[in-house]
Design a protein with these regions (language model features):
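Small-residue-centered hinge/linker elements
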Residues: 58-60, 65-69, 79, 95-97, ...
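Conserved catalytic cores of soluble enzyme domains
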Residues: 119-248
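Conserved P-loop NTPase/AAA+ ATPase motor core
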Residues: 48-50, 80, 103-108
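Short beta-strand/loop segment at the start of cytosolic alpha/beta domains
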Residues: 3-72
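A short, well-ordered alpha-helical element
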Residues: 57, 85-108
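Glycine- and acidic-rich phosphate- and metal-coordinating loops
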Residues: 72-76, 110-119, 150-154
C-alpha cells in the first residue's frame, strides 16, 4: 500500500467527539452507555452562574469489550467547558472506576480506558471538582492492582491540572503528536510567570515542553502513536494483553527524586536536557 493510499485510508481520532472516541475503541456492538444524556444528570451549579449545562456534564461512561475483554471506557468531551471537571462529571468517573473494582472482586476482569481532554478542575465548581479528582485518583490506584488502567491523551485540549496527576497514576499512558500533558496549562503559567518566560501562543515552544513526543522521549509516556483510530486501538489492545505492569511509574518515585536533585534550578532546563535526564527510565 502506497503512502498516499495510507493517508487516504487514515481515520483521525482527535476529530471525534467523546462518545465517538469511545465507540471507536470498543468492539463493534458492545457499547453500552451508563448515565447517558437522557438520564439528564447535569451540573446544578452552572445554571446558577448563567452557564448552559450539558446533559451528560461532558463525560461519557460506557461499558463494553475490547478484544472480548470487559472494559469501562471513560471519555471527556473537550468541547464542553474545556473538558473541565465538576461535581457530576467527576462523580461519574470515580463511580465507574469503583464499579470496575467491584467487577474484579466478583471475578470479572474489567479494565479501564480513560480518554482525557481536560483542563482540570472546573473553576465554577472548584472545591467539588477537587474532591472528585481526589476520588478518581484513589479509585485508579485501587483498580490498577487488578487490571490495567490505560490513559489516552490524543488532543487537542490536552490533559492538565489534577487530572494530569491522575494520568501519572495510570498503568500505561498513550499520547499522540497533538496531545499535551502537564500540571499547569500554558495560559496559567504565562499569567504567573509572564510572557517573556512562557509564551502560551508559541505552539512549537509549548509542544516542545508538554507535547506527546517530548513526554514519550522523556519516559513520561509509554507510547507515542499516530492520530489514527486503528493504531490507538491496537496500542490499547497491546497494553490490555500485557496486563498489570511489574512497577507503576508513580511507585518509582525514588528514581525521579534522584534525577530532580541533579537539576540546577538556577538555570532554565531545556526539553533536550529533560530527555537526557530521564534516559534509561524505561529500561
Amino acid at each position: 500500500m502506497t503512502d498516499i493510499q495510507s493517508l487516504l485510508n487514515k481515520q483521525d481520532f482527535i476529530e471525534l467527539s467523546a462518545r465517538e472516541r469511545a465507540k471507536a475503541l470498543l468492539d463493534k456492538g458492545t457499547f453500552r452507555e451508563l448515565l447517558d444524556p437522557f438520564a439528564r444528570v447535569m451540573s446544578p451549579w452552572l445554571i446558577k452562574q448563567n452557564i448552559v449545562p450539558q446533559a451528560d456534564d461532558g463525560v461519557v461512561i460506557a461499558k463494553g469489550t475490547i478484544q472480548e475483554q470487559p472494559v469501562v471506557l471513560i471519555s471527556i468531551e473537550g468541547l464542553f467547558q474545556g473538558g473541565s471537571l465538576g461535581e457530576v462529571g467527576g462523580a461519574k468517573i470515580a463511580g465507574a472506576l469503583k464499579l470496575a473494582v467491584e467487577d474484579n472482586l466478583k471475578g470479572i476482569p474489567t479494565a479501564a480506558i480513560l480518554l482525557l481532554e481536560t483542563g482540570g478542575v472546573r473553576l465554577q465548581e472548584a472545591n467539588l471538582g477537587l474532591a472528585a479528582i481526589a476520588e478518581i485518583q484513589a479509585a485508579i490506584v485501587n483498580l490498577r492492582q487488578y487490571q490495567p488502567v490505560i490513559a489516552v491523551v490524543a488532543g487537542s485540549v490536552g490533559c492538565f491540572g489534577g487530572m494530569s496527576i491522575a494520568v501519572g497514576l495510570c498503568s500505561y499512558i498513550v499520547m499522540t503528536q497533538e496531545g499535551r500533558l502537564g500540571l499547569n496549562g500554558p495560559q496559567v503559567i504565562e499569567q504567573e510567570a509572564g510572557v517573556q518566560e512562557y509564551n502560551a501562543k508559541d505552539r512549537p515552544f509549548i509542544w516542545s515542553i508538554t507535547g506527546g513526543n517530548q513526554r514519550f522521549a522523556s519516559g513520561l509516556a509509554d507510547a507515542y502513536v499516530d492520530d489514527d483510530r486503528q493504531k490507538i486501538r491496537e496500542q490499547v489492545i497491546d497494553y490490555l494483553t500485557q496486563g498489570v505492569p511489574q512497577q507503576h511509574r508513580s511507585s518509582n518515585y525514588s528514581f525521579y527524586l534522584a534525577k530532580l536533585q541533579q537539576v540546577d534550578t538556577a538555570e532554565q532546563i531545556t526539553p533536550a536536557q529533560v530527555q537526557a535526564l530521564y534516559q534509561g527510565e524505561q529500561a
